[in-house]
Swiss-Prot record:
One of its GO terms (molecular function) is RNA binding. It is found in: Virion; Host cytoplasm. It comes from Wheat yellow head virus (WYHV). This is Nucleoprotein. Its main location: virion. Belongs to the tenuiviruses nucleocapsid protein family. Keywords: Acetylation, Capsid protein, Helical capsid protein, Host cytoplasm, RNA-binding, Viral nucleoprotein, Virion. Encapsidates the genome, protecting it from nucleases. The encapsidated genomic RNA is termed the nucleocapsid (NC), and serves as template for viral transcription and replication. InterPro entries: Capsid_Phlebovir/Tenuivir (IPR009522), Nucleocapsid_Tenuivirus (IPR008864). The modification N-acetylmethionine is found at residue 1. The lineage of its organism: Viruses, Riboviria, Orthornavirae, Negarnaviricota, Polyploviricotina.
Amino acid sequence: MTSMVEIQNEIERVTALAVKYISENKDSLVVFVGQIDYNGYDAGKLLSILKEKAKGRDFGRDLCYLLVMRYTRGTGFVRDVRKKIKVAAGADTAYEIVTHYGVVQSVGDNADAITLGRLAALFPYVSMNIVKSVSTGAKLALDTSDLGTSGLDILLWDFVPQFINLDSVDAPYCNKKNTSNILFSLHLLQGALTTRKTMPDQKKKKDNLTTDFDLLKYTAELLVITCSAKNLTDNKKSTYRKKLVEPFRENEDYKADFWTALGKLSTGCLKKMKKDAQNYLKDRTTVLKLMVDNCSGTDDEAAKAIKDYLTVDD
């Protein structure tokens, strides 16, 4: 069995390869974006499979291209790749990489399946660098329209929970005045709203996910599992968290528009939820409690309450 240290070391090795590729080939990745225009797993086993498949190849490069697919076209893109691309060069590149690694759209009955989502979660720092590198040259596949705010997209991608440190695996999950509290709160809301919009109605009924309360509870359970993963050391989580929020920081503090965005999230999203959902959120994190308590006020009042509560260390 692969040890946790071996898993962490292998992730760091491949991360270094991929980040190096990003720094040296950003233009190529952005071009590739244009050319393709139109959760519980065994990390050790998946890494072993990838390492074997990557023999004789530049896996850093391949990983970058796979993650570009993930964040510009979505996880379903790997199905019938050639039919979904308007530029031949992009079709050839994408098809060759997807086929070589055997990337599939969903796990299905294969516990060891390689999916774009699993790759994104396994190498979260690479994912973050991909999103930051191609965001100016592509429309990224993220829908935040139901949050009632804007400007927080980089914090809402599926790799971010890998950077979160929980204070407890039982509610409240985050009660410190730090960045993890903010990120967990954002992802609980984004995850529930995304599930509400994208999950077929028939499946929602079958799984009893027909109310905001049900969706939040479902999302929280999955999010806690994801945040509890030990693929990254706590030090790495902290380092990557700080890198993630750099665009929102100025002179050791968060910028004014960051607090404004959180205030709008409170008044534009939480205010619309029913009382049972609001009460559930109040017990998940201290930031969500503040947002619920101030959702009936103005954007500025909600933003001030959140800013006054939080500190700006980690």
